From Swiss-Prot:
Belongs to the plant acyltransferase family. Keywords: Cell wall biogenesis/degradation. Coiled coil: none annotated. One of its GO terms (cellular component) is chloroplast thylakoid membrane. The gene is CER26L. PANTHER family: PROTEIN ECERIFERUM 26-LIKE, TRICHOTHECENE 3-O-ACETYLTRANSFERASE. Disulfide bonds: none annotated. GO terms for biological process: cell wall organization; pollen development; very long-chain fatty acid biosynthetic process. This is Protein ECERIFERUM 26-like. Involved in biosynthesis of the epicuticular wax. Plays a role in very-long-chain fatty acid (VLCFA) biosynthesis and is required for VLCFA elongation in leaf. Despite its classification as a BAHD acyltransferase based on sequence homology, CER26L does not seem to share the catalytic mechanism of the members of the BAHD family. Highly expressed in flowers. Expressed in leaves. It comes from Arabidopsis thaliana (Mouse-ear cress).
Amino acid sequence: MGLVQEEGSGPVHGFRLSTVSASLPSETGTTHEPTGLDLAMKLHYLKAVYIYSAGTARDLTVMDVKAPLFSVFYQIPCIIGRFRRHESGRPYLKCNDCGTRFVESHCDLTVEEWLRVPDRSVDESLVYHQPVGPDLAFSPLLYIQMTRFSCGGLALGLSWAHIMGDPFSLSHFFNLWAQAFAGGKIYCPKTSVTERDFQNPTSTFKKPDSVKQVDLVGDLWVAPNNSKMTTFSFNLTVNDLKTHFPVNGDGEFEILTGIIWKCVATVRGESAPVTITVIRSDPKKLKPRAVRNGQMISSIHVDFSVAEASLEEIVKSIGEAKDERVVIDEIVDDVSDFIVYGANLTFVDMSEVDFYEAKVMGKSPESVYCNVQGIGDDGAVVVLPGVVEEERVVTVTLPVDEIEKVKWEMKKCGLITPLV
């Protein structure tokens, strides 16, 4: 019997919690040891929402959604594990321990009405989220929320502890669910630490600029903030971006990063960021896919005024990013706590994540949203693929007292329209 929980007075309500486990138990004593790079992500979470039309999902029952999870969890038992600590204090994962939480809810709107809102950050209300802790042995690493719209459409929202894996891992997990739902055979290989061959590691030891050590948080894994953060999102097309901001030889992500960095720098004035972090896919793209933290984490430092520099100069500096994963992996010890997202102004390229491969009844989602929970005070920008190949969804998380000023700078330069 699930737990019934009514929360809030908005259009999403009627929360009912239950547990989903693997189809078979794992071998007794199966554990997973997180790497230093995993532990650097300990205070961050990914929140993803897949929305399917009524025509696709009207006849899907709760059991239809739950059943494929049994085999996926058996293939990836760490996802439904629970953390413990070694005597040294270093966390480790006891695999296939207690399952995950499945949340059922209802929305009073239709899918069409829900998607009519231009700011897709509203989708975060379709994700049931709880941080890991304070009781590590009882804290799930994954929550799955199934929301039924009034028209019969369906949203599946995931709250994913980033210590388990990067956005590609989350997408891989959900694509496996879709394959199992369609009756296909699934297989997820295990990835050993020795298989992590990071490209262009830093040749000499230097404290990485892309991470920031924070005060110890104990067993409640929540990133500390001095500022109240807020989020908004907007859509654009690659063609419009390159037409209005022509920069020779550079991709849309670099151009977007340069524009938004310049806007934030203008707003922050004397405290304008001269160091940023860029997180994107590993150029080597480990295959076959596995659940891991393999995303490339780089820092860029400039010695000029970003607010006054040309877009070409800023974009050129982004091409000189230094991959810091090896050093991050080395410096993160057993007990210290760090943040990555928002340690500096952080730009995350998820445009290559294959979110729209998660087909139900042969149909791709109507919309997919993904963002990071636990962003530090310097803020973060996430670039997502749109439902149309040439479209991008840009999600911006900044301190409350900056967000409207940054929006205004984006309007002035022509990145967003006055309607946003």
